[in-house]
Each structure stands twice: as C-alpha cells, then as structure tokens.
Amino acid sequence: MIKVCVIDDHAVVREGLKRIISENPGMAVTAEASDGQEAMRVILSEPCDVVLLDLTMPNKNGLDVLKQLHSESPRLPVLVLSMHSEDQYAVRVLRAGAAGYLTKESAPAKLVQAIRKVVRGGKYVSPTLAEKLVFDLDSKSSKAPHEILSDREYQVLCMIASGKTVTMIAGELGLSVKTISTYRVRILEKLNMKNNAEMTRYAIKEGLVD
C-alpha cells in the first residue's frame, strides 16, 4: 500500500485528491495538512511513502517545506502539485529536491502515474519540462535575468507582479515588512530595475505570472 500525505490549504483540493487516490488500488491518503507548519508535524508523526505538496500556503510556504523535508528526510519523495505553470516554478522545485512537478490542471491518470513513479525512486516531469531542462543544460550562458535571483527573491518578484503589496506578501510568508522590502530592493538591483511597474512588465513578458 502506497501511503500518501496531502499538503494543501484548500479543503476541496484535499478532498478531490483523496477521491482520486482512493479509486486506485494499492494507494491511499493516510495523512493531510492544511499549511506548512502543520505539514512538518504531520509528516514526522505519520510516516508516508510520498508527499503531495502545494506551493502557495499560509504560515510556511511549500518551497520552504520542500527544502526542510529534503534536508531532514532526503529519501522521502515529494511531488509538487501546484496551480503555477511549469515555467514559473518547476525548475526551482526540482533543484530544491522535489521528485516531480505537476500542475493542478493535470489529468487524474497523470497524477497516479506520477505517484507510482516517484515512489519507485524515479522523477516525474512532463515531456515539455523535460525538453526545457535539457535545453537549459545546453544554454547555461544565456540564462534569463530572473534566474540569478534566490528562491525567496523569485517568490517575492512573482507576488509583487501579481499585484500584492509588501504588507500582503509579509503576511502570507510570515516575514516582516522590513524583510520583504529588503528582498524587493535586492530584486530591483539584480534586475537593474527602478520600480514595481518594471518588475511587473518583466514578469508578464517572461511568463512568470498568469
């Protein structure tokens, strides 16, 4: 029996995933959490074979949870299931230790296929993402400007470009307004930009926001 832990802040999503998984012999959702902090407690107290992890959550975001899991339980496969398109986060989460990446629009059959593959020790990416990864390896010298940003800076960039204020971002990430403002300044410096409008135009042009 494949034991699955589902981490998502939306109850309707968790219920949908439980239904999909329960319809497949040999696997079941045995634990769930609604935010990042709860996720770490649940995973430590209720061992599982694979984690389905959302990225955008309150208290502790998915990327931070992923990094902590990879550090503390490197053999536990984490399959990121996100509303964000592959272009936005897939490469970063794979570098951070994820075993695979799927968007929430993916067909249920692909989700089940991905779960079985990562539990066996494999990696799951879509053909499109696999092609992008190969292309990136062949063109390291021509990286996009935003690829020099740290994961946190990249996250703040995407949130600003989505129309969120520094105060809103601080609340969602559980950080101080001063800290988010510092990240904003670093982003502007690294991308050689002057204001939020330029960051937003850039993010839209590069497909970093929907």
Task: Annotate each language-model stretch with its function.
Residues 143-178:
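Helix-turn-helix DNA-binding segment
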Residues 13, 58:
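The feature encodes the CheY-like receiver
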Residues 88-95, 100-155, 208-209:
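Short, flexible helix-to-coil linker/hinge segments that flank and couple to helix-turn-helix
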